[in-house]
Regions:
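Alpha/propeptide regions of enzymes that mature by internal proteolysis
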Residues: 1-232
């Protein structure tokens, strides 16, 4: 399905080169997501995953994403995600018609159930963003189930990559599927259902590849930084 593949695009903001991924779904799609723009469940014509600089200064990320969408000619309702990770290093995996695309940046990671209380204030842009597209319609419950399944697969992949964490504080998940119309749609998307299992495997492979690649990039950057420090 054409809408299942994201398109990598470039832009400049304040003199800095940045990238974003766009899924031009068109009519007849529903999305369930934790996106900062257009989150929740409903019809969505597009999905945007935009890179922003580290130390993101703006306090209106939803408006910022809407501006990027407008510049790309994206009309109608959509879902917008944000990340400080290198979007050009995105990873993709496929399984039985399900496509998972992930942008990974794991510099600020930890466990969901941390002992300290949350800050309650705005957080830095999410660093593990997952976009999943399916070729079959899902019921409302199955869409929510699919987001949970994707999250479980993400944590499994991070552990398999040797990371002691469940993710980063601002990870986001976005699941897109055709509108069921008068049909109820697939009722289940848990990890032991047909489509949930395919989703889980695709997400696991994409996150695992992204986590390993991210670790290698961090190690290379760290070595370069150490090499630039004058030795006593």
């Amino acid at each position: 399905m054409p809408g299942q593949r994201g398109e990598l695009l470039a832009r400049r903001e304040n003199g800095q080169g940045l990238h974003h991924l766009v899924w031009r779904l068109g009519p007849g799609w529903r999305v369930c997501s934790s996106a900062v723009l257009g989150g929740g469940i409903g019809p969505r014509a597009w999905i945007l995953n935009a890179q922003v600089p580290g130390g993101y200064p703006r306090l209106d990320p939803d408006r910022h994403l809407a501006e990027i969408a407008t510049a790309e000619g994206l009309g109608g309702p959509g879902a917008g995600l944000m990340t400080a990770a290198d979007v050009t290093a995105y990873t993709t995996a496929h399984d039985g018609g399900v496509t998972a695309t992930v942008t990974s940046g794991l510099g600020v990671r930890g466990w969901a159930a941390a002992p300290a209380e949350g800050t309650g204030g705005p957080l830095a842009p999410g660093t593990v963003n997952i976009v999943v597209t399916l070729p079959v319609a899902l019921s409302d419950a199955a869409l929510v189930n699919a987001v949970a399944t994707a999250t479980e697969a993400k944590v499994q992949a991070l552990l398999d990559a040797g990371l002691d964490c469940s993710g980063t504080p601002t990870d986001a998940v976005c699941v897109a599927a055709p509108d069921p119309g008068t049909d109820a749609g697939e009722p289940f998307a848990g990890p032991r259902s047909l489509w949930g299992a395919r989703l889980a495997r695709a997400v696991h492979r994409a996150v695992l590849t992204g986590a390993v690649d991210s670790g290698e990039r961090d190690a290379t950057a760290g070595a370069a930084l150490r090499g630039s420090v004058p030795q006593a």
